[in-house]
UniProtKB/Swiss-Prot annotation:
Its EC number is 2.7.1.35. This is Pyridoxal kinase PdxY. Coiled coil: none annotated. ATP binds at residues 114, 151, 184, 211-214. Substrate binds at residues 12, 47-48, 225. NCBIfam families: PRK05756.1 (NF004398), pyridox_kin (TIGR00687). One of its GO terms (biological process) is pyridoxal 5'-phosphate salvage. Belongs to the pyridoxine kinase family. PdxY subfamily. It catalyses: pyridoxal + ATP = pyridoxal 5'-phosphate + ADP + H(+).
């Protein structure tokens, strides 16, 4: 019987709704991953509601918790680390310390960094020190980097004028160290308004994918967290880059279809769980 992969997910958590680990953990478990959630912040709800309560985990607690796992002899079983929203740059450095500790215990372990920087229109902006950390430190350590368009622009200090520019920008990030760049949401002049586009760039391959863009009165939160978690999970389950890319897009689309059908603001993960595991429609990635 194949061994079940283990993944340490270090990102935010909300008590109500789905963002950060609350968006990613259950879907990753549903497709066959043992997830170890470590919450960088715990908020009552996501910040787009305009009000919330909660607290940030002190940075020193991150390696302390992981050291506890090492103490029971389980750290070498960790196959991957996923990081997302950070409450501070100090948290980010603590995560890189943990990544190094895990790679020492298991040299084959992967690290996927979702470089969450937020967006002015969505009411979630990380501190400048966090953006600097992601740009200057995290990208050099990550095996996989999963920015959205805003974050790609920040990494490259420019905005694209075409899809070709997006490819060039993602390729430039490979020089910092990652094996591949997954751009979770493309936005560039000339892009069709009725499509949602993604891009996957590695040293020897470039894949572009389109699916229908679904309309919502209020855009659901947590889609990027879901995307990064599913992509890393499929790699751990043995998919190559293209298949992980296509599966992730299809599964996320299934969640959004159910969310739209229910008129929900929060992602309908539970109702869509079977379609997360077995998407009904596959969107073919095109090699560029």
């Amino acid at each position: 019987m194949p061994r079940t992969p283990h993944l340490l997910a270090i990102q935010s958590h909300v008590v109500f709704g789905h963002a950060g680990n609350a968006a990613a953990v259950f879907p990753m478990q549903r497709i066959g991953i043992n997830v170890w959630p470590l919450n960088t912040v715990q908020f009552s709800n996501h910040t787009q509601y305009g009000r919330w309560t909660g607290q940030v985990l002190p940075p020193e607690q991150i390696p302390a918790l992981v050291e506890g796992i090492a103490g029971i002899g389980e750290l070498g079983n960790c196959d991957a680390v996923l990081s997302g929203y950070l409450g501070s740059a100090a948290q980010g450095r603590a995560i890189l310390e943990v990544v190094g500790r895990i790679k020492q215990a298991n040299p084959r372990a992967l690290y996927l960094c979702d470089p969450v920087m937020g967006h002015p229109e969505k009411g979630c902006i990380v501190a400048p020190e966090v953006s600097d950390f992601l740009l200057e430190e995290a990208a050099a350590v990550a095996d996989y980097l999963c920015p959205n368009q805003l974050e790609l622009d920040s990494f490259c200090d420019r905005q694209p004028n075409s899809l070709a520019d997006c490819v060039e920008m993602a390729r430039s990030l490979l020089a910092r160290g990652p094996r591949a760049i997954l751009v979770k949401h493309l936005n560039y002049p000339g892009k069709a308004g009725d499509t949602f586009e993604m891009l996957l760039v590695a040293a020897d391959q470039v894949w572009h994918l389109q699916r229908p863009l679904l309309a919502f009165p209020r855009q659901p939160v947590g889609v990027g967290d879901l995307t990064s978690g599913l992509f890393l999970s499929r790699l751990l389950l043995g998919d190559d880059l293209r298949n992980a890319f296509e599966f992730t897009s299809a599964a996320v689309h299934e969640v959004l279809l159910e969310t739209q059908a229910r008129g929900s603001y929060e992602l309908e993960l539970v109702r869509a769980q079977d379609r997360i595991a077995h998407p009904r429609v596959r969107f073919d990635a095109v090699r560029l």
